[in-house]
């Protein structure tokens, strides 16, 4: 991951079972995807996800390869998890848009508008855009498009 930019997407929680799973508090955007076999940066280590699954209504569990005991995963507890921008095109929402976190503080297409942030509310993602801060913009294909690795605000 050395040539790619890393983005914080989660924080690891306590161990869940004897089989190496632990809770992960991950950004809502990623909760519905199968993250198995991708690499993630955990603290200073690059780890491969062996299994990622939903637990109960709004919780997720993760298991990293070669982490099979409570002792081994306990040392990962409370560590920040980051994902590389090399996965930008691999995880797209129903509107074919990537995770908006990849575009924070970047221009939206060729405009002077900049994505300042985003938040998740009741199954919807809303974006805050410079010069339009009074109106959160829904993150969907009616307002945004994704072309040539650029996020574009549709006028």
Region annotations inferred by a language model:
Residues 1-155:
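Short Lys/Arg-rich amphipathic alpha-helical segments
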């Amino acid at each position: 991951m050395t040539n790619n930019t890393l983005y914080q997407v989660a924080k690891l929680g306590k161990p869940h079972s004897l089989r190496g799973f632990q809770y992960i508090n991950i950004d809502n955007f990623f909760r519905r995807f199968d993250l198995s076999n991708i690499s993630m940066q955990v603290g200073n280590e690059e780890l491969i996800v062996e299994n990622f699954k939903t637990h109960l209504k709004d919780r997720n569990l993760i298991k990293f390869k070669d982490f099979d005991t409570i002792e081994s995963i306990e040392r990962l507890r409370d560590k920040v998890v980051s994902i590389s921008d090399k996965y930008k095109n691999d995880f797209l929402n129903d509107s074919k848009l990537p995770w908006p976190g990849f575009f924070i503080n970047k221009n939206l297409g060729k405009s002077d508008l900049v994505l300042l942030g985003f938040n998740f509310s009741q199954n919807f993602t809303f974006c805050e855009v410079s010069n339009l801060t009074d109106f959160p913009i829904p993150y969907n294909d009616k307002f945004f498009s994704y072309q040539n690795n650029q996020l574009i605000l549709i006028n």
